[in-house]
């Protein structure tokens, strides 16, 4: 009964989030990793707040140090949320019910990013393990890797539906892989060497879609925020609105169809890599709005959207 009541509450909150923005206008939803509470949280930041009145959904994890989150649609399970945390844990849960549909305790050390590939394979990038591991989803619990590739300081993975490749960042490298799952359950991963390139600055950290331009990717490093153009292979720094992103240490970033940008960087109050404030740039231009929460310390922020691009 409690689970049914909770599910009804989540559905009502989602409806309220859409209603509050007016007819035909989509709310600005974010998913964020609350490391101080070991929770995934989804907020509607349309009104510039992160509190109990704008909390849409939350999910408690069994381990601390939640590092990555993605919202995707699975042909098998419907809408799902994927996350990695602890030293070697990853899972995929149904949304909004929060039921585990896949999990593993076999990522490489310090997992940072996770992605659901449409063929049914899950990729996990781990920074201390210098590795991306690939898992099939046929086993619900304690899934073991079916393939792996080496990438120094692996921090981000993102599927590209247009090019049918998995983009990945680590160290000062951006590269991409084809991933296939055959009828026998074997996973084959091949690096697309022609897409491998050096990032101009070191310590690549986040990799995210630019929803308003599918030919671009967000890439953050220890010192800079880039928009990478896939066609020209250019790391663009002086894009429109870059003045509001002229900062170092951005841990998570994303943008909406209208160009609005959300990002987070550390304040060091809880951990050296977490912060209490999400920054929001309306339509990508102007000064960022600081949206501070008093109930958590966060690491990664994501635009809450099932689309890959």
What are these regions (language model features)?
Residues 31-36, 81-87, 123-128, 166-172, ...:
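Conserved beta-strand positions in repeat-built beta-propeller and related beta-rich domains
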């Amino acid at each position: 009964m409690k689970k049914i009541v909770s599910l009804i509450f989540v559905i009502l909150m989602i409806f309220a989030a859409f209603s509050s923005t007016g007819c035909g206008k989509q709310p600005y939803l974010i998913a964020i990793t609350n490391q101080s509470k070991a929770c995934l949280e989804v907020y509607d930041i349309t009104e510039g707040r992160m509190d109990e009145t704008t909390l849409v959904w939350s999910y408690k994890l069994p381990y601390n140090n939640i590092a990555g989150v993605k919202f995707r649609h699975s042909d098998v399970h419907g809408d799902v949320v994927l996350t990695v945390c602890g030293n070697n844990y990853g899972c995929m849960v149904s949304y909004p019910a929060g039921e585990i549909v896949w999990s593993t305790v076999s990522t490489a050390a310090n997992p940072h990013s996770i992605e659901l590939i449409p063929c049914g394979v899950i990729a996990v990038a781990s920074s201390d393990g210098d590795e991306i591991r690939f898992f099939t989803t046929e086993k619900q619990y304690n899934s073991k890797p079916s393939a792996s590739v080496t990438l120094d300081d692996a921090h981000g993975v993102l599927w590209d539906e247009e090019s049918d490749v998995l983009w990945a960042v680590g160290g000062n490298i951006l590269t991409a892989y084809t991933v296939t799952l055959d009828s026998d359950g074997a996973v084959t991963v091949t690096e697309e060497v022609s897409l491998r390139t050096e990032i101009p600055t070191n310590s690549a950290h986040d990799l995210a879609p630019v929803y308003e331009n599918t030919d671009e990717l967000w890439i953050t490093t220890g010192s800079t925020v880039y928009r990478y153009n896939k066609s020209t292979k250019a790391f663009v720094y002086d894009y429109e609105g870059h003045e509001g992103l002229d900062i170092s240490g951005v841990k998570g970033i994303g943008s909406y169809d209208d160009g609005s940008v959300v990002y987070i960087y550390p304040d060091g109050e809880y951990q050296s890599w977490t912060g209490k404030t999400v920054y929001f740039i309306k339509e990508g231009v102007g000064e960022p709005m600081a949206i501070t929460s008093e109930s958590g310390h966060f690491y990664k922020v994501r635009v809450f959207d099932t689309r890959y691009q």
